[in-house]
């Protein structure tokens, strides 16, 4: 899920990271040998920095093994590159500094390609969408229009401090906005009839319905209320790797594998992606 505060933590590192780039660039140079066309830290192994705490996108399963959408996609990537995959699980705030310090080849944690981050790393094209939708009880017949939901009679829930909370207030200003510190509590408020709708990411609705007998449904708006995208990050200067990553994403997007992986792991339909 996209917390506004989650990404702010990395901003404090920008100045230090920028200085680190200069140090690393002077201290060492990448190997451009024919046997290492993507300039990997260890030839033959793709080392990826992750923060495995965001189920179902990326997490540790019951056996302590990396799992989720990102992991399935990375395994397909490593297979296509004919290399081994090595995942390093770190705190979120250590990912970009670690990438700049060449502790791994890329970061896969659904990063938004913000101007601040672009100063220190290079991004691939988007590989994961974060679609905010509105969900209602399955027996609710409220039309899927902004006008119908932007009404003083409606109460709409969201996760406290999230993009969803901002969307509720911006898109439905006449409705009562009710935010919760716990995502499940926001869902249950609607499922039990104490609220009318919830703004949430589409895959989180799918996860809730798995264990709650499909008590909620997505309101049939023509498109999501809002879509953000996450990209892979690589070290600045490694054009060969970022070019391959973007090409791979386009390939699996066009052949349907991306949608298959998303449905398999997220339990939801892949939202619209930028065209290749």
Identify the residue ranges that each predicted region occupies.
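Short, low-complexity disordered leader/linker segments with a strong preference
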Residues: 1-43
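Extracytoplasmic small-molecule ligand-binding "clamshell" domains
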Residues: 31-110, 119, 264
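Ligand-binding cleft/hinge of the Venus flytrap
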Residues: 58, 62, 74-83, 146, ...
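Extended ligand-binding regions for polar small-molecule ligands
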Residues: 71-80, 140, 162, 229-269
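Flexible hinge/capping segments at coil-to-helix
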Residues: 137-156
């Amino acid at each position: 899920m996209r917390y506004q505060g989650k990404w702010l933590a990395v901003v404090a590192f920008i100045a230090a990271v920028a200085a680190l780039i200069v140090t690393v660039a002077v201290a060492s140079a990448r190997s451009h040998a024919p046997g290492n066309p993507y300039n990997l830290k260890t030839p033959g192994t793709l080392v990826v920095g992750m923060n495995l705490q965001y189920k179902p996108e990326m997490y540790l399963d019951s056996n302590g093994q990396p799992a989720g959408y990102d992991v399935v996609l990375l395994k397909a990537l490593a297979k296509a590159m004919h290399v081994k995959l090595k995942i390093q699980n770190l705190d979120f705030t250590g990912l970009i500094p670690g990438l700049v310090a060449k502790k791994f080849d890329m970061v896969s944690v659904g990063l938004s390609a913000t101007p601040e981050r672009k100063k220190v790393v290079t991004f691939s094209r988007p590989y994961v969408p974060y679609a905010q939708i509105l969900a209602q009880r399955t027996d609710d017949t409220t039309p899927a229009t902004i006008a119908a939901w932007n009404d003083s009679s409606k109460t709409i829930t969201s996760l406290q401090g999230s993009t969803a909370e901002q969307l509720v207030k911006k898109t439905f200003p006449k409705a009562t906005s009710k935010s919760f510190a716990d995502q499940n509590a926001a869902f249950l408020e609607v499922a039990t009839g104490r609220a009318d709708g919830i703004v949430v990411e589409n895959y989180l609705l799918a996860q809730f319905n798995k264990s709650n007998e499909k008590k909620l449904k997505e309101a049939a708006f023509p498109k999501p209320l809002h879509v953000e995208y996450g990209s892979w990050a690589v070290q600045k200067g490694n054009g060969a790797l970022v070019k391959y990553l973007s090409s791979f994403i386009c390939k699996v997007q066009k052949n349907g594998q991306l949608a298959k992986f998303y449905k398999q792991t997220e339990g939801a339909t892949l939202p619209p992606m930028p065209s290749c």
